[in-house]
Amino acid sequence: MWGYFFGGNSQQKKDLPKKAIVELREHIQTLNKKKNHLQQQMDDQDQLARKYVSSKQTTLAKSALKRKKGYESNLLKVENQIETLETQLISIEGANLNLETMKAMKQGAKAMKQIHGEYDVDKVEDTMDEIREQVELADEISEAISRPVGNEFVDEDELDEELKELEAEAKEQEQEHRVPAQKAKPQPVSREEELPQFPSVNKKAPVVEEDEDEEALKALQAEMGL
């Protein structure tokens, strides 16, 4: 430890906080074990004193209470030591945490300084100006490419006049379709066309039917041998 204050090894300086924290935790653990042991001895002497009081052994009871008081005094000292070490441990852990935080911040500041050393505000402004110029150039190129070709000399007034003529023509055609067509005059109907049509009767049809019946009768008679 004295080497730390009088320029000892740098590695030992770095490891000293961690080593102190470990040693403090181990010693606090040892004191807690001692505390539990003293508490148990106090309880044993208290029970022994109660036993002697019950058996009317006053002298032995006083001796047990005396030993209990001794253990109680030692227990109080141990508890105070534990409290002191715990306070110191918390302080060292906090200081060590602050140290590690400062190291990280210092390393971060060093990295930022290295990064910013490669450019400054003027360089950033120059870069932004170059970007703006390139964006404007890209817009001009895009506009030139998308501009229509061959329609620069079209007369807009002439187009409007032609459009009006087409609209007037369409309106005129629409009005013509709305005028009802004249009904055709009815043609005179002849007398014959006015009379109802009846199917013509074939007067020779019964003769044909009679001949067929006669032939059928003759065939039947021949078949029967008549």
UniProtKB/Swiss-Prot annotation:
First-listed, main subcellular location of the protein, grouped into a coarse class: cytoplasm
Biased composition (Basic and acidic residues): 168-179
InterPro entries in the record: Snf7_fam
Region (Disordered): 168-226
This protein's GO CC annotations: cytoplasmic side of plasma membrane; ESCRT III complex; multivesicular body
Membrane topology: Peripheral membrane protein
Entry keyword Transmembrane: no
Biological-process GO terms, alphabetical: cellular response to lithium ion; cellular response to pH; filamentous growth; filamentous growth of a population of unicellular organisms; filamentous growth of a population of unicellular organisms in response to neutral pH; filamentous growth of a population of unicellular organisms in response to pH; fungal-type cell wall organization; late endosome to vacuole transport
Record keywords: Coiled coil, Cytoplasm, Endosome, Membrane
Subcellular location: Cytoplasm; Endosome membrane
One Pfam assignment: Snf7
Coiled coil: 18-182
UniProt key word Cell inner membrane: no
Highest taxon, organism lineage: Eukaryota
Biological role stated in the UniProt entry: Required for the sorting and concentration of proteins resulting in the entry of these proteins into the invaginating vesicles of the multivesicular body (MVB). Also required for the proteolytic cleavage of the transcription factor RIM101 in response to alkaline ambient pH.
Family label: Belongs to the SNF7 family.
Subunit structure: A component of the endosomal sorting required for transport complex III (ESCRT-III).
Descriptive protein name: Vacuolar-sorting protein SNF7
Species of the source: Candida albicans (strain SC5314 / ATCC MYA-2876)
Classification lineage: Eukaryota, Fungi, Dikarya, Ascomycota, Saccharomycotina
Gene: SNF7
